[in-house]
């Protein structure tokens, strides 16, 4: 028993001596056993150093916590979007340019495009030739087209090869301003002898302002007059309720009337001056006077878009009456211009006249109609002027034009 007790005591002492000092929690300044030994505690790393003759733990160095390394997230590769194949815009089919009235009869569909194209080219390549313009608004009135000079400018360029006014005025007035407008017109016109001709009972009558504006509800017409000094005046009726009427706001009306002004100007200083300025229709076919002005208005308003020109021209084309070729032939070239009198109010001189002028323009450009007017002013007949311009006898062209209009109108 005594021997076992000694054995147990010996083992206990041996285990105590074998346990390392570092097993104790290190503390700055506390005794350690071996220089260079390290130990960690409370987030610090301590090193056993020699201080004098002693070995002690230093103050320790804080252990940096490792930054967490983000686990990369896999990004799915984008699915490529297929690039759509562009659908080619179909190129509009441009019809062959007509060179003769026979070409027109074979392919009337070429007329609208080439009349528009030749007008567009003329406007874009020319400069306006009038210089002095004044826009006058009556005291109790307004104006539907706020910037009429744009329309006058385009029409001036369309007919830049022809004489244009030295000075012209546009007078906008309502029914309330009727007397004021007539007085202003007579003051500016300043040609008493010609004014008496214009105001004769078989022509315009004594009151040009009232002709344009006969009542408050019907004050939306317009009319030009030109004196022998080349001064032109356009009277424009004003009805504010017509602000949504496109033809009165987009320049069409102004271009129509300025075409008349240029027609007038061809008679200034001409052999037929007095009667021609008193009434163009004394010499020029009525359908050419009004149809030519309708064409000038639409072509000058829409040189930038064949589609808009096409839409606008339908106002005339769709209102052409359905008649046979014989009726149209007599309408175009009647025995007497008195036959046109009943057709003024019903519109044929505008609608049929537009179609004929469009045909002229498709063949020879926008100046064709005005050159006929100019030659008539100089004393030529319609037959002579037409043949000079087109190289074809008028009587040969009339039946072709009549057949074309009758055939095309029958399709609508």
Explain the meaning of each model-derived region.
Residues 2-23:
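Secretory targeting and sorting signals
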């Amino acid at each position: 028993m005594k021997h076992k007790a000694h054995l147990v005591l010996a083992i206990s002492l041996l285990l105590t001596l074998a346990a390392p000092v570092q097993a104790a929690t290190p503390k700055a300044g506390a005794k350690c056993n071996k220089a260079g030994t390290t130990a960690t505690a409370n987030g610090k790393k301590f090193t056993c150093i020699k201080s004098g003759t002693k070995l002690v733990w230093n103050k320790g160095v804080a252990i940096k916590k490792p930054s967490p390394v983000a686990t990369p997230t896999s990004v799915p590769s984008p699915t490529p979007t297929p690039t759509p194949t562009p659908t080619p815009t179909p190129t509009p089919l441009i019809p062959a340019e007509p060179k003769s009235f026979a070409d027109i009869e074979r392919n009337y569909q070429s007329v609208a495009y080439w009349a528009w194209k030749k007008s567009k080219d003329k406007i874009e390549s020319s400069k306006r030739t009038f210089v002095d313009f004044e826009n006058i608004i009556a005291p109790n009135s307004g104006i539907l087209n706020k910037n009429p000079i744009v329309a006058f400018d385009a029409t001036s360029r369309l007919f830049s090869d022809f004489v244009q006014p030295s000075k012209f005025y546009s007078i906008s007035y309502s029914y309330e301003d009727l007397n004021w407008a007539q007085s202003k017109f007579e003051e500016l016109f300043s040609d008493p002898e010609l004014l008496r001709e214009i105001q004769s009972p078989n022509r315009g009558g004594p009151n040009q302002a009232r002709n344009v504006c006969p009542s408050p509800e019907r004050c939306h017409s317009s009319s030009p007059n030109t004196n022998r000094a080349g001064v032109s005046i356009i009277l424009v009726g004003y009805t504010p309720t017509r602000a949504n009427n496109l033809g009165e706001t987009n320049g069409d009306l102004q271009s129509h009337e300025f075409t008349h002004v240029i027609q007038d100007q061809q008679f200034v200083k001409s052999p037929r001056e007095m009667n021609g300025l008193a009434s163009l229709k004394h010499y020029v076919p009525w359908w050419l006077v009004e149809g030519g002005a309708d064409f000038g208005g639409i072509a000058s308003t829409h040189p930038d878009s064949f589609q808009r020109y096409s839409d606008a021209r339908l106002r005339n084309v769709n209102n052409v009456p359905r008649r046979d070729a014989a009726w149209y032939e007599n309408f175009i070239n009647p025995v007497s211009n008195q036959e046109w009198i009943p057709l003024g109010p019903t519109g044929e001189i505008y609608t049929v006249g537009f179609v004929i002028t469009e045909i002229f323009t498709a063949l020879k450009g926008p100046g064709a109609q005005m050159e006929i007017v100019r030659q008539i002013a100089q004393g030529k007949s319609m037959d002579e002027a037409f043949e000079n311009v087109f190289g074809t006898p008028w009587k040969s062209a009339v039946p072709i034009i009549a057949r074309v209009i009758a055939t095309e109108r029958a399709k609508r």
